[in-house]
């Protein structure tokens, strides 16, 4: 088995150029996802929890937030497949005392029932076998304790993905099909499918709440356009289209124009819809 466990393709992806893009844009993306972070942690009961797990922790902002909520005596582990993102997580001045582990949550041999709480912000949609992954994650959580995560609802309900994607498709003519249930941001956009996976993996008291929210940024329209060239569905379509530099400039300018249309009171805003998922192990 490779160092990426049973998710070799995703391991390579997140440890190469795309992973580096998320390292570079970590601060910018944390700003955009701040409201969603609040939604994830809203009403989370960490009483009596001494060991917490953050699945797909990336550069560690959610891990640090979890540690703050759980208190100084708690032990918090952030797990991710990307060493690039974990290196950034470990370098943060507030990461002292947190454990950051490079591993594949689908196949990693967790200590049985070693955690009393598990959370994730958009970190659980990238498994080759979601059933096996959640079954393995469940084994790491004490019986009767909560797993809480957020994931994306369908593409059409998320402007931050849809708008840049449509722009690239319109300009380049590239064919871009929705990835469906393949590992990726939208893998769990079908809530019935998601619920069935969790039930089959052995979770109970499953609640999937649809939450309408927004992604906002104080960045300039130019800086926002640069980010859209490097992350998200627009970026994926650009990779597929392989446009010339001239066409890339056209795409960037279109992103700037769209940003100006969305700009109000100093904020660029995109409508977003997510699922907030709670399940008991």
How should these model regions be labeled?
Residues 72-73, 141-147:
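Short glycine-dipeptide loop
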Residues 51-108, 132:
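Class I SAM-dependent methyltransferase SAM/SAH-binding core
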Residues 116-131, 153:
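A short SAM/SAH-binding and catalytic strip from SAM-dependent methyltransferases
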Residues 2-28, 207-265:
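C-terminal helical/coil "lid" or tail adjacent to the Rossmann-like core of SAM-dependent
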């Amino acid at each position: 088995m490779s160092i990426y466990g049973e998710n070799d393709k995703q391991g390579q992806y997140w440890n190469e150029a795309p992973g580096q893009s998320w390292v570079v844009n970590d601060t910018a993306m944390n700003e955009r996802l701040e409201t969603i972070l609040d939604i994830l942690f809203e009403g989370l009961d960490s009483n009596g929890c001494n060991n917490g797990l953050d699945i797909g922790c990336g550069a560690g902002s959610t891990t640090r937030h979890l540690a703050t909520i759980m208190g100084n005596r708690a032990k918090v582990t952030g797990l991710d497949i990307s060493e690039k993102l974990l290196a950034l997580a470990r370098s943060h001045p507030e990461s002292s005392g947190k454990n950051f582990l490079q591993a594949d949550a689908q196949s990693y041999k967790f200590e049985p029932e070693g955690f009393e709480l598990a959370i994730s912000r958009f970190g659980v949609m990238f498994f080759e076998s979601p059933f096996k992954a959640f079954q393995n994650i469940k084994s790491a959580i004490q019986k009767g304790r909560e797993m809480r995560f957020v994931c994306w609802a369908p593409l059409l309900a998320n402007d931050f993905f849809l708008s840049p994607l449509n722009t690239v498709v319109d300009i380049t003519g590239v064919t871009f099909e929705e990835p469906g249930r393949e590992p990726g941001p939208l893998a769990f956009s079908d809530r019935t499918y998601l619920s069935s996976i969790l039930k089959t993996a052995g979770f109970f008291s499953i609640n999937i709440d649809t939450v309408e929210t927004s992604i906002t940024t104080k960045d300039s329209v130019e800086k926002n356009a640069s980010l859209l060239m490097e992350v998200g569905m627009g970026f994926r379509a650009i990779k597929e289209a392989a446009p010339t530099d001239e066409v890339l400039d056209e795409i960037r300018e279109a992103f700037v124009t769209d940003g100006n249309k969305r700009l109000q009171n100093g904020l660029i805003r995109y409508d977003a819809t997510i699922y907030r998922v709670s399940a008991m192990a």
